[in-house]
């Protein structure tokens, strides 16, 4: 990492995907552990993903315990590197923005461009692996749904639509668990598909205004995508649907096997013969379809069942917004001790 060799020491690679590599690192001065993600900006797709992540995380003016925190971002071209800032006018930054807007490389392809993200280090893997490696626990389910509800309300309050909520993109931090808490801390991460809506002419002082920001790019992971995302006309209510898929799957331990990776994943779906169909796709075809909730348990708390049904409504107007959702999750967890039965 060119500009920060004296500041960070890369320890080991902890993850690798199609867009980049993640390392465990330490801050030399303090010994604190951080995660360093290196994204190679060699294609318009990679550039757009990296910029979206930077724009979303750098737009947040305060920290939230359940949202990954961006310490800094460094942009590197060959041996030249500089710390990025929101709204930068540097030539390196503007070249990447132009590439993202035009959908084609606008800089010298012989140059090696990288974006380095320094973020919280999460030592517990992702939510999917964590839950599936343990027996179901009401305490864990309660803790996780409250943390996720709080995180989503925070993001929407900051005009950020995540657009790819799924257990693989929710990290586990066991080392930073609050004192007295028996459960680990969740961190919503991977903002490569996110959208910041504050620049769309909306009133940033109006908490629910993010739900009036209409988007048209169909993106995300199919088993967590809302019906309207498949159509290409949606708002932040698509995040509510995705969280509904996650919570329902978590409570009942509903899983499926990804065809490409053969990995077992948490996620609710519709069974059609021998095939499993994403909920959003099935509801798009049949908006009046009744979801079989609970699917595996003999019974489910009436308040929880009703909330999941509303979160997974085919009509986004019938879903609670993130602020109502957060309050209802707290109410269910605190007032109804049998919610997970």
From Swiss-Prot:
Chain positions recorded as ATP binding sites = 14-22
Organism name: Danio rerio
Which principal EC class is assigned to this enzyme?
transferase
The molecular function terms in GO held by this entry are: ATP binding; protein kinase activity; protein serine kinase activity; protein serine/threonine kinase activity
> What's the name of the protein?
Serine/threonine-protein kinase pdik1l
Q: Which reaction does it catalyse?
A: L-seryl-[protein] + ATP = O-phospho-L-seryl-[protein] + ADP + H(+); L-threonyl-[protein] + ATP = O-phospho-L-threonyl-[protein] + ADP + H(+)
Q: Which PROSITE patterns match?
A: PROTEIN_KINASE_DOM (PS50011), PROTEIN_KINASE_ST (PS00108)
Q: Where in the cell is it found?
A: Nucleus
Q: Which SUPFAM superfamilies does the record cross-reference, listed alphabetically?
A: Protein kinase-like (PK-like)
A single Gene Ontology CC term = cytoplasm
Domain Protein kinase: where? 8-332
Q: Which domain of life is it from?
A: Eukaryota
Family, per entry: Belongs to the protein kinase superfamily. Ser/Thr protein kinase family.
Q: Which UniProt keywords apply?
A: ATP-binding, Kinase, Nucleotide-binding, Nucleus, Serine/threonine-protein kinase, Transferase
Name the Gene Ontology biological process terms.
negative regulation of G2/M transition of mitotic cell cycle; negative regulation of G2/MI transition of meiotic cell cycle
Q: What is its EC number?
A: 2.7.11.1
A Pfam family of the record is: Pkinase
| Origin organism lineage | Eukaryota, Metazoa, Chordata, Craniata, Vertebrata
Q: Which PANTHER family match?
A: EUKARYOTIC TRANSLATION INITIATION FACTOR 2-ALPHA KINASE EIF2-ALPHA KINASE -RELATED (PTHR11042), SERINE_THREONINE-PROTEIN KINASE PDIK1L (PTHR11042:SF58)
